[in-house]
A protein has these predicted regions:
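A short, flexible loop at the N-terminus of ABC-type nucleotide-binding domains that lies
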Residues: 16-28, 35-48, 97-100
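Helix-to-loop junction immediately C-terminal to a conserved catalytic motif
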Residues: 77
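ABC ATPase NBD Q-loop/coupling interface
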Residues: 86-103
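Conserved ABC ATPase "signature" region
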Residues: 140-158
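Conserved ABC ATPase signature
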Residues: 162-166, 170
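Catalytic Walker B motif of ABC-type/P-loop ATPase nucleotide-binding domains
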Residues: 187-190
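Conserved ABC ATPase "signature" C-loop
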Residues: 240-241
């Protein structure tokens, strides 16, 4: 009898360990009580921040200026080192050694709001080649991968152009290709549509969609709630270095109180939908539309 009870307890412990392991590997990013303060500041940029991001999701990280979203991204990529707390990438704790940071940067690519900060090579082709060669690929493998990415992303027309001569939209496309050629698990984009016209915004959005089709987890920092509403699977709201809400996109987009705390407003498309339901023009039984195109289709 005692032996049977011991066996049952052992099995329960094993199952719990397996369940924990499965739940941990479900998350490509886990941040636990992360703190960061910039030198000379008394205010924490990150204040006991905790957050889990599941694999393959499109996640918008939002909040007012100084909320900590850009600092969090820099910590994820190893550019900044938290003063306390832990960050796990694909279940592995970030180690702030040369080898550990190299491993992190293989897994996580970051595209800054201003791509001029990360484009240094004389031509587009050389720029996209640089990262993969620097990571140790031989020239033949690198050339094949770069040609494939250039073709796939439609960059052939200006692959020999100097990067400094490109438009802002083209530079952002090259910066994305520069990371994508290395097959990251996570892509981080800081304000991907900032300062772009409609044409280049559309192209950048198409590139982001290709990332998610490849199973890459995509995180963006943005102030644009309309953009996030139409694009993201989930939204993370931040304020004063903390995560104040993390949920599926439509939950967040209808949570007026949480949005207000994050210095945001309910998307105008949802406000319009509410007015139309109040006037009985549309039914309130459906989930609100994410985009103006979706709203228009319901009216036709």
């Amino acid at each position: 009898m005692m032996d049977k009870m011991k066996d049952m307890k052992t099995k329960k412990r094993t199952l719990k360990k397996e369940e924990k392991k499965e739940s941990e590997t479900e998350y490509v990013i886990r941040a636990e009580n992360v703190d960061y303060t910039y030198e000379g500041s008394k205010i924490k940029a990150l204040d006991h921040l905790s957050l889990n991001i599941r694999k393959g999701k499109k996640v918008a990280v939002m909040g007012g200026n100084g909320c900590g979203k850009s600092t969090f991204f820099l910590c994820l990529n190893g550019i900044r080192r938290p003063e306390s707390g832990r960050i796990f990438i694909d279940g592995k704790l970030i180690e702030y050694t040369k080898k550990g940071l190299l491993d992190v940067r293989r897994k996580i690519g970051i595209v800054f709001q201003n791509p001029d900060e990360q484009l240094f090579s004389s031509s587009v082709y050389e720029e996209i080649s640089f990262g993969i060669l620097n990571m140790g690929a031989d020239e033949e493998t690198a050339e094949k991968a770069v040609r494939q990415i250039i073709e796939e992303l439609g960059l052939s027309a200006f692959q020999e152009e100097p990067t400094h001569a490109l438009s802002g939209g083209q530079k952002k496309q090259v910066a994305i290709a520069d990371i994508l050629v290395m097959h990251p698990e996570v892509m981080i984009l800081d304000e991907p549509a900032a300062a772009l016209d409609m044409k280049h915004t559309k192209k950048v959005n198409e590139m982001i969609e290709r990332l998610t089709e490849k199973g890459i987890t995509v995180l963006i920092a943005t102030h644009d709630i309309e953009y996030a509403c139409g694009w993201a699977d989930e939204i993370v709201l931040m304020h004063e270095g903390k995560v104040i809400r993390h949920a599926e996109t439509m939950e967040i987009c209808q949570d007026e109180e949480a949005l207000k705390e994050a210095e945001l407003e309910i998307p105008t498309v949802i406000r319009m939908y509410r007015k139309l339901t109040e006037k009985k023009i549309l039914s309130d039984k459906e989930e609100p539309p994410r985009t103006w195109e979706e709203l228009e289709s319901r009216l036709t």
